[in-house]
């Protein structure tokens, strides 16, 4: 058998996923969830349709949050925020009805994460909504900037952190 690695939280850079497969021979899976949605909302794991792809192409596919877990519905609203509903989502924040009302609207939990849904119905997480950088009218996620920098072969580690600006 192969060693399997499951990563939850922000996906590692595509290059790291590729190296896990090619250099270590491990099988990579990506999970997405929040404390409020315990244990998870989506899962992305190797599947037969990825087999013909190159290691780099497979890594790019596996770096997304994947498809909804059993019994979970996800969508992205007009503002680009990821919403979810299922029976695993919290009923509310303890003794915080106002915060609960902000987080759960019309039965949909607002994750606070920005993202999109790809043509193959996988969820792509862009960034935490509050970490998006607005430059020249364009929304740029810190994850995208990290990925671009990390793709350079001389870069071993990188972290991009958005800092609020008056502009």
Where are the language model's segments positioned?
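Active-site phosphate/pyrophosphate- and oxyanion-stabilizing loops and adjacent acidic/basic residues
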Residues: 18, 63, 98, 147
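Gly/Ser/Thr-rich phosphate-binding loop
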Residues: 1-60, 73-79
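Adenylate-forming AMP-binding core of the ANL superfamily, especially NRPS adenylation
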Residues: 11, 42, 52-95, 102-106, ...
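AMP-binding/adenylate-forming catalytic core of the ANL superfamily
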Residues: 76, 86, 91-92, 99, ...
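Active-site glycine-centered loops adjacent to acidic/histidine catalytic or metal-binding residues
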Residues: 9-10, 33, 66, 86, ...
